[in-house]
Amino acid sequence: MHISEKSCTFAAVFENNMSEDQKTHIIKTAGEMFFRLGIRSVSIDDICHELGMSKKTFYVYFESKDALIEQMLQANIDYIGGKMKSLSEQGDFRQLVKKFLKHQEAEKNDVRRVPQLVYDLKKYYPRQFADFQVKCFEMQKGYIKQYIELGVAQGLVRANLNVELAAVLFAKIHNDAIRDFEEIEMHNHNLHQLAHTAMDVFVRGILSEEGLKLYNEK
């Protein structure tokens, strides 16, 4: 029986897609467990039990727990990047800010679970955490710069603003807040409260008179 090259290619693509789906499922399940229980307290055995999967199958996709954590963090960056890219395609600065604030509010429950995850990453996986922070910083800086440039073009952000520096400032505030969450909690505040306040102060600081007038009507 002759099997065409096209059929073989389709089979290979299908098999690869199935493999990626399984890998994504493992990352998603493990990520949820890490957020809920902390990274240190969740073993590969726990993840496999939750998935109904053998350790042999797990190791087909990840050579170690460290490798899983690295890919989970990359998946998180991709998720945040997707959200920010979607906002950058709005074409309307006022709507962009509204949606940014809406996303922030919708994800407040997830933000409250971040401290345990960050604590474990800082203590037990410092290299992966440092790499994650660098990637997050660069990604956020790039998109925030796009947002601000859109606002300037539409007359809603101050034309004399140092756009590059403002984008760096926003990304640094966000990343430092996640890294130093213990200091925030010492003052009886949480990450969501800080993120909301920082966003409000930042936006008010960069807006033109017209932009501020519209922002106050939100």
Model-identified regions with their sequence ranges:
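C-terminal peripheral helix-coil segments that are non-catalytic and often amphipathic
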Residues: 1-16, 146-150, 154, 183, ...
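Short secondary-structure transition hinges
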Residues: 109-145, 153-156, 164-165
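Short glycine/proline-centered loop/turn elements that form peptide/ligand docking sites
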Residues: 1-17, 32, 41-43, 51, ...
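Helix-turn-helix
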Residues: 25, 33-71
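Hydrophobic alpha-helical connector segments
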Residues: 71, 85-113, 167-170, 192
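Hydrophobic alpha-helical segments that form the core
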Residues: 159-181, 191-205
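Generic hydrophobic, amphipathic alpha-helix propensity
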Residues: 22-33, 47, 72-76, 80, ...
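Amphipathic, non-transmembrane alpha-helical scaffold segments
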Residues: 19, 69, 73, 77, ...
